[in-house]
Amino acid sequence: AQQFWDLIIFRIGVGVGEAALGPIALVVLSAYFTREKLPLALGIWGAGPFLGSALAGWGGAAMITNMDAIKPYLGFLSEFSDWRLTFFLFAIPGLIFALLLKFLPFPQIALEKKEKVEFMPFFKKAWKFFLLMFVGVTITGLVGYSVLAWGIEMLVRVHDIPKTIAGQNFGIFNIFLGIGGSIGAGIIASKMIERGIINAHLRIAGIFVILIWVSLLLFTLSTSSFYSQVGLAGMIFFMSCGPGLYGAAFQNASPINLRGRTAAIYYISANVVGFALGPFALGF
């Protein structure tokens, strides 16, 4: 990319790949795991972005700092600027894992004719569930992604915390609380479903959504930098619990042959609306 618009176009291309991953991953994981184990599986999978963002931040900073020592081993790639090389090197593991997926066996699911359900008749019966989930996930995403995008700046501008300290604390919150919340919520939901509480993921998600708003008020209204960071940490923790629970709810409520479509509905509400409009609306 040589110009701003080149970079935007290529970033959109990356986004297309990211958008395709979510629904496909939900369908694949729901085929591998039972209803009882699915929340935990999706919780572990949902912890990936928190781990990745933390590693990218810390690893990227370390890589750029030591780039002069790395470049002699990169051959012709050493002619590129440091930030481009950082992107290249971090992309290599992703390409390797993508190739390894080719050899991952997919469970064979035989659908009886009577088990196949048309989308519109099913949606007419379950539209209330999907509407409420769509609205809830969208609103939560608008708030959550806005805080993730602007949380550091708020700590810097409102509480005069040095940007390096604010960024470091934000990374620590993500890697420990983000991963812990995502996996922990999955463990709790799976245990509850095993005990016969089939809507456990929705119950837990409902409680955590309330706690997100409590944390949001503490983060935004507190005059103390300490309590504001406590609120931010709470938001990250309770937000991280959602994706695995929401995904499991959509998959468990859908017929097997419609899971891809319902997963797409979930990601439209969570990502397209929440991720695209949330930070933009707050910045505007």
Residue ranges and their predicted role:
Residues 126-185, 239-243, 247, 275-282:
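Extracytoplasmic gate region of multi-pass secondary transporters
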Residues 253-284:
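A late C-terminal transmembrane helix in Major Facilitator Superfamily
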